[in-house]
Amino acid sequence: MTGVRPVRLIHDKRAAGWSEEDIDQFFLGRFDCSRQKYQMAKAIADLQEPILKAGSVPKTYSLYIGIPFCPSRCSYCSFVSCNLDRDRKMVQPYVDCLCREVEEIKAQADKAGLTLCSIYIGGGTPTSLSADQLRQLMGTVRENFDLSKVMEYTVEAGRPDCTDAEKLAVIKEYGATRISINPQTFSDEVLAGIGRKHSAQDILDCYADARKAGHEDINMDLIAGLPGDTVEGFEHSLRQAIALDPENITVHTLTLKRASRIVMEDQKENDYADVAAMLEKCHLLAEAGYRPYYLYRQKNTLQNLENVGWCKPGHEGYYNIYIMEEVQTILSAGAGGSTKLVADGGKRMQRIFNFKYPNEYIQRFAEVLERKKGVADFYDHDLGPETVG
């Protein structure tokens, strides 16, 4: 089976009135899925149903805010991001534009009669902003939206080399209910190999600071298949993450992305033969009380394997589910942002794209604001052609 959203197929078949037996045959017979993988996908679909129902209420939406800056570029990354040291002068003008775009999104959402459901500030690395810049951005969010009615507010605090106690306190003070601290691995050697300028101990210290700041819903990302890692090394990272007891642990499989340094250095998929054995260690998560709640795949992922979000009961990441299952409008702010407008139960969709690079986003910001008027227009008129950038 190929495709990004295998769980979506289960939801679609159920919505079409298929029996559970016919769905089983579809996956196990037609696509020859492994029973273990299919049972996981089906359990995820069962868990998601009430969450999707809540997120599918007409005219609800989630807000994504992108911060395309990082302290360094990881070897596996192909996202649009700027080196913080090289492009620091661009950061403040970018934040100023971003705040103005958030205000415009609020105006257009109100005009369209939309209700905010969740917020996600991602990147890049959002904590590459200074504490004052985080206050400016998150203050703008708080001034424009009633956070008491938001189901979830996530900020990626991914890297300990730019996440300190002050920033963690700001994130908490300004209303975030969920953060993500992303070690990827707890091996110092592997961290150095992928271009991370911090140690495993720095991750532990950052996690402790987050708990001291009062953060009660923390996700941690790990990647199976990183260069130089082993099955034993990945198991160590998994056990270390479990020992910290975060509410979420997301296990990604390495994807060989065309613009990443890994691919440019001509490393091949057969250099990562142990990745399936690494993912088999995820039984440790189930044994520790975590359960899978969302699943997706990407093109060029090692051995066509999957990315799975695991959580403790009651700590499912709503935004992750909504964006992956395409049941809800996502309004996006920032460079590279892709707004996805959804109506009529997913039968009508339209995208509005922001400019890809931060400098172009800043220089052509008036056009960014003009395009956002398409949000209200979408809900006033029939679906038209996609707006591209």
What role is predicted for each listed range?
Residues 59-95:
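Canonical Radical SAM [4Fe-4S] cluster-binding loop centered on the CxxxCxxC motif
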Residues 1-8, 12-16, 20, 49-53, ...:
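Radical SAM enzyme core and accessory elements
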Residues 126, 300, 336-339:
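Short, glycine-/Ser/Thr-/acidic-enriched flexible segments
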Residues 66, 180, 248-252, 321, ...:
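Beta-strand scaffold of nucleotide-dependent catalytic cores
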